[in-house]
Amino acid sequence: MILKVCGITTQWDADAAIAAGATAIGFNFYPKSPRFVTPEIAAAITTKGARRVGVFVNERPARVEEIARIAALDVAQLHGDEGPGDYPGALTVWKAARVTPNFDFAQYDESPAEALLLDGPAAELYGGAGHTFDWTLAAASSHRIIVAGGLDASNVARAVELAHPWGVDSCSRIESAPGKKDIQKMTDFLHAAKAALGA
């Protein structure tokens, strides 16, 4: 099971997330994101056994692999328009998708991604927008699902109940400012998520 906190920019926030039970830490390498970090900054942040996830948007596979080497990533989370031919060959992939009412899981049937990370719809934004989606849509999928988008301690149990996911992910709803985690909100989210997932 995955308990992920995304948009980590400091060692302090990473330590607090892991202490509260996070099993995956997300670093954003999309330059237009307010949570952007360089590969060197990410490399300097230790994660004590939690999976290291890099967020990318329409980045060249060779560049993803280069950043993964520098930052010691375990997973590439691809948020753009990437198809299987754009996946980095040497890295586990989580493919992010924005869920709309007519979302079709069949488009990912041939995807070699380890999981689909489902996010709420948000025009021109690639994650971190804080929008939820209809979690019941995820329950019908045969894919391994990570639910993201607008999650915090107040709603993660309901999301797990309706979506039956492999994991959950939160970013903007547990911040005091973009790129700066609110430790109490983050801790409350992770504790609620652990209880809901039976982790």
UniProtKB/Swiss-Prot annotation:
One Pfam annotation reads PRAI
Query: Catalytic activity, per the record?
Result: N-(5-phospho-beta-D-ribosyl)anthranilate = 1-(2-carboxyphenylamino)-1-deoxy-D-ribulose 5-phosphate
Give the keywords, sorted: Amino-acid biosynthesis, Aromatic amino acid biosynthesis, Isomerase, Tryptophan biosynthesis
Listed EC numbers: 5.3.1.24
Which HAMAP family does the annotation name? Answer: PRAI
Q: What is this protein called?
A: N-(5'-phosphoribosyl)anthranilate isomerase
Q: What class of enzyme is it?
A: isomerase
Q: Which domain of life is it from?
A: Bacteria
Q: Name one GO biological process term.
A: L-tryptophan biosynthetic process
This protein's pathway reads: Amino-acid biosynthesis; L-tryptophan biosynthesis; L-tryptophan from chorismate: step 3/5
Gene expressing this chain: trpF
